[in-house]
A protein has these predicted regions:
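Catalytic domains of carbohydrate-active enzymes, especially glycoside hydrolases
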Residues: 7-23, 79, 198-200
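Surface-exposed amphipathic alpha-helices with a cationic face
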Residues: 11, 46-54, 77, 96-103, ...
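Active-site pocket-lining/capping segments in soluble small-molecule metabolic enzymes
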Residues: 19-21, 26-33, 41, 170-261
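Active-site-adjacent beta->alpha loops and helix N-cap segments on the catalytic face
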Residues: 27-47, 66-70, 88-106, 117-120, ...
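Catalytic alpha/beta core domains of metabolic enzymes, predominantly
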Residues: 107-217, 225-226
């Protein structure tokens, strides 16, 4: 299928992880009327993508814990997932259930994107047993009744959460990044915050692979260009003075305030 070709090329362009997204339960209701992605992937897609990839890891986002979780997670592992992500959990018990089902058979990442997951953050970190964490800004800002996805970044919430992961030695990331020069909050600002906060992972926004590209070769060129520009900018960040990041925080707050006013 055409989408499988895109996944292979994403790997060749330097994307280190390729997703299969099984999450459907509750997502439509949470994000009703929003211009967000509902992937519609299936368990069969895991096997197809696994066969395509040679160097990139295969990350599968499963559904939040429900009565069919054990069967779903077992099949995801059998089909070759390298990492399984648990989304939209609210309790320590849900995390514990997830980790018990996986039982060390592949890597695990927790997607902190509900108000309750943040309220139980210390307990979840103390429980341990998961490999990494990601902060999902879209559902998180909705959960807190905020207006704009990047409010948790501008108001210091993401920084506080990242500090706890860092102290616990848990690799972490947050949100996603658009192409350099794009986004309501420019990608450069977001990437600089990733660097400042010690984040080591982010999700590429749909602007890298949306429906505007009907010509495959044009998409391939634009995709590689977008990745190269991000990598170049990332390589410059360690050389920049602290004042750059102080000014960047100010810009993040200003740009977010413009959106929410």
């Amino acid at each position: 299928a055409a989408s499988d070709v895109y996944k292979r090329q994403a790997e060749e362009c330097g994307v280190r992880r390729v997703w299969v997204d099984l999450e459907m339960i509750g997502k439509e209701a949470r994000q009703l009327g929003m211009n967000t992605v509902k992937s519609g992937h299936t368990l069969q897609d895991i096997s197809v993508v696994k066969e395509i990839l040679t160097t990139s890891e295969l990350l599968v986002r499963v559904n939040p814990i429900y009565k069919g979780s054990e069967a779903e997670i077992n099949e995801v592992i059998e089909r070759g997932a390298d990492i399984i992500m648990l989304p939209f959990f609210h309790t320590l018990e849900e995390v514990d259930t997830f980790l018990r089902i996986v039982n060390g058979r592949c890597k695990t990442t927790l997607l902190f994107e509900s108000k309750e997951s943040i309220e139980h953050l210390d307990e979840i970190i103390a429980l341990g047993g998961f490999d990494e964490a990601h902060i999902g800004l879209n559902d998180l800002h909705l959960s807190y009744g905020m207006t704009f996805m990047f409010e948790p970044l501008s108001n210091g919430m993401v920084e506080q959460i990242c500090a706890k992961f860092k102290e616990a030695g848990i690799p972490y990331g947050f949100g996603g990044v658009a192409k350099i020069g794009e986004g309501l909050l420019p990608a450069e600002c977001v990437i600089a915050e990733h660097y400042r906060l010690g984040s080591t992972r982010a999700i590429l926004s749909r602007s890298f692979c949306d429906n505007q590209y009907v010509d495959y070769n044009k998409w391939r060129y634009e995709f590689q260009l977008g990745i190269n520009q991000i990598r170049l900018y990332e390589s410059l960040l360690p050389m920049l003075p602290e004042t750059y990041f102080v000014e960047n925080i100010k810009k993040v707050k200003e740009d977010v305030n413009k959106v929410i006013k």
